[in-house]
């Protein structure tokens, strides 16, 4: 456990908290918004038992990392990721992104290439684009982003409760695939995040990662749940597979947005199988 300094704001440094466990080829876990690295608990033990070195860090504004008032665009977040890889001198790394973390992974490749990477994993992907269009009617537009940001400013804690209901499909899975205690832990993590960071990251939903994906030339796995109410499988997972047709693509039946929790066994099985025998992926032009 430690901190990596990625910048400064006025008189204080911007430090990212990270944990580094195990040995072997590194697996870097990129959490979803508005959660932090603790959300990977269902995957951590499985990865370590399989013999991987696992690095999980809290992006700026979340978890135990610094909470600056700026720097929440994907270019900055991807640059932070690059500094983590460089500071720890990680090579042959596999980036495992969930939700917002997939945007960081894609933008990192777009900015820095794949020299340090062995593979990429996109779970419930924000890429290729979450912008509403004829091709993606379930996406968001400027008005949708503004609505979410207003809800966060009005009552962030009530908004978070509603968000987690849709993250985990609680009307279907509470008491079956997810406990009240797990929901409470996720709520506490989201509530503890910087309100500025929580609000600011929403703007990133309007980013287009199509050009970034063109630089993906390493082994790639795409995992998407068929019941994701946030990033629909038609609008996101299947479109990402169209952009990366040589990726290993797996749909998890009934998986909600945070299927790493509700369908942990299925996610872990596919993730570990991919890490054992990765399938090469090359983006389409």
Model-derived features: where do they sit?
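Conserved HGGG/HGGXW glycine-rich cap/lid loop of the alpha/beta-hydrolase fold
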Residues: 9-70, 84, 230
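Conserved alpha/beta-hydrolase "nucleophile elbow" surrounding the catalytic nucleophile
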Residues: 31-33, 93, 97-102
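Residue in the alpha/beta-hydrolase core beta-strand immediately N-terminal to the catalytic nucleophile
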Residues: 58, 94, 119-121
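Conserved acidic catalytic loop of the alpha/beta-hydrolase fold
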Residues: 76-93
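Flexible "cap/lid" loop of the alpha/beta hydrolase fold
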Residues: 106-154
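Conserved alpha/beta-hydrolase catalytic His-Asp/Glu region
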Residues: 131-139, 151-214
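Conserved loop-alpha-helix segment in the C-terminal half of the alpha/beta-hydrolase fold
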Residues: 215-255, 266
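Catalytic active-site module of serine/aspartate enzymes centered on a nucleophile-bearing elbow/loop
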Residues: 245-285
């Amino acid at each position: 456990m430690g901190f990596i300094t990625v910048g400064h704001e006025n008189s204080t440094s911007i430090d990212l908290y990270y944990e580094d466990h195990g040995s072997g080829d590194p697996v870097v876990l990129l959490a979803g918004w508005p959660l932090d690295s603790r959300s990977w608990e269902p995957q951590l033990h499985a990865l370590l038992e399989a013999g991987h070195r696992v690095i999980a860090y809290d992006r700026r504004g979340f978890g135990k990392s610094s909470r600056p008032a700026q720097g929440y665009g994907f270019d900055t977040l991807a640059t932070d990721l690059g500094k983590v890889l460089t500071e720890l001198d990680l090579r042959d790394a596999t980036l495992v992104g969930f939700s917002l973390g997939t945007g960081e992974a894609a933008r990192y490749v777009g900015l820095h290439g794949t020299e340090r990477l062995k593979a990429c994993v996109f779970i419930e992907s924000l890429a290729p684009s979450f912008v509403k269009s004829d091709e993606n009617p379930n996406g968001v537009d400027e008005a949708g982003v503004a609505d979410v940001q207003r809800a966060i400013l009005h009552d962030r804690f009530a908004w978070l409760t509603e968000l987690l209901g849709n993250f985990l499909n609680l009307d279907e899975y509470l008491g079956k695939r997810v406990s009240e205690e797990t929901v409470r832990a996720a709520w506490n993590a989201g509530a503890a995040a910087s309100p500025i960071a929580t609000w600011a990251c929403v703007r990133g939903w309007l980013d287009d990662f199509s050009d970034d994906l063109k630089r993906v030339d390493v082994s790639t796995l795409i995992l998407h749940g068929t019941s994701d109410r946030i990033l629909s499988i038609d609008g996101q997972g299947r479109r990402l597979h169209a952009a990366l047709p040589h990726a290993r693509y797996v749909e998890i039946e009934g998986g909600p947005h945070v299927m790493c929790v509700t369908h942990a066994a299925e996610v872990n099985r596919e993730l570990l199988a991919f890490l054992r025998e990765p399938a090469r992926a090359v983006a389409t032009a």
